[in-house]
Amino acid sequence: MTSDRTLSISTVTHIINAPLEKVDIADWLFNLPDAEYQRCSRAHIGAGTTTSDDGRPMTINVETIGDALMVQHFVSEVRESKYCRLVSISDAITPKGRTKVQVVWELSAKKINDHTCEYSNHIHARATDEFLAFIEKNGVTFEQARAAR
């Protein structure tokens, strides 16, 4: 097992044909219609916004990853127009039961020129202690769990 417990890392970038000044990731993310979230990926089932117990903005995302239904409770740690960082202790509902995975989601935009910018979507999923106990109980190796994502 890797010492950092990484299950998966993914970064996707896209060129936006608009000046950086016109991009507001935080506004888009926390006002994203459910239908638009679903159009972003066939794996996306639904999304909505709420607040944490301490009042921080949250987005709840439901999607499938591998053989798991994921309910992600993303709490905003940084919420700026050009950069957002959210952390979720996500519920992973699998054929063998339910467990938890930590997911860090970072979205950013940077200027390319006066007319375009680059959007970046970075996801880093890590095993929690509960997840490690769950896979051990179910006879699944860490490498098998990682490959299932």
Predicted regions and their residues:
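General N-terminal targeting signals
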Residues: 33, 77, 134-136
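Residues at beta-strand starts and edge strands
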Residues: 6-10, 23, 56, 84, ...
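Glycine-rich portal/gate segments that line the openings of hydrophobic small-molecule binding cavities
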Residues: 45-98
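Beta-strand/loop substructures that line and gate deep hydrophobic ligand-binding cavities in soluble
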Residues: 91-149
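Hydrophobic ligand-binding cavity/cleft-lining segments
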Residues: 1-56, 65
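Short acidic, gly/pro-rich beta-turn/loop elements at beta-sheet edges
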Residues: 24, 69-72, 129-133
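Short amphipathic beta-strand and strand-loop transition segments with alternating hydrophobic
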Residues: 1, 46-51, 75, 104-111
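A short, structured loop/turn motif at beta-sheet edges
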Residues: 18-23, 78-83, 108-118
